[in-house]
Amino acid sequence: MSINPNPSFQEVVTKVLKENYVNCEGRARRYEFWMFVLFEIIVGVVVGFIVGFLIGLLGIKSLSFLIYVPDLVFLCPSFSLVVRRLHDIGKPGIYVLLAFIPLVGGIILLVFMCTDSVPETNEYGPSPKYGNVNPSSLNIDPRNMSPTP
C-alpha cells in the first residue's frame, strides 16, 4: 500500500466525489475530511454569491432554492466521508447519527473529526496515514502518539 502523505486538494475532492461517493467502507484521514469540508465551504460561498447576484439582477426571489443544491449534491459523499473518518479513529459508523442530537451531537462529532488516526490496522482496514505498520515497531505509544523511551 503506497501512502501519499499530502494529496493535492484536487486529488482529495476527486477521490471523495468519484471513487468514494457512497462508499462507507474503509478509512479516511483528517486531511481528506477537512480538505473536503473546505471544498464544500468554497462551493457554498460561490453558489451563494451567484444566486444572490441573480436574485438581485433578475428580481426573482424564487431562485433562492438554488442555494441548497450543493447541500443536496454533497449529502451522500459527506455522510460516507464522516463514516470513513469515524472508522479511522476506531469508532463504528453508526456514530454518524450523533449529528441528530442538537448541539451536543455536533460537538462530539467535531471532536471525533479532529482526532488523529489510529495508527494500527483496525477492523476497517490499514491506516491511510500510517500504512500497514505495527506501531510497536516504531516505538510509538498509540494512546498518546509520543515516542516511548
List each model region and its residues.
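Hydrophobic alpha-helical transmembrane segments in multi-pass membrane proteins
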Residues: 31-85, 89-114
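Membrane-interface extramembranous regions at the lipid-water interface
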Residues: 1-39, 78-94, 111-149
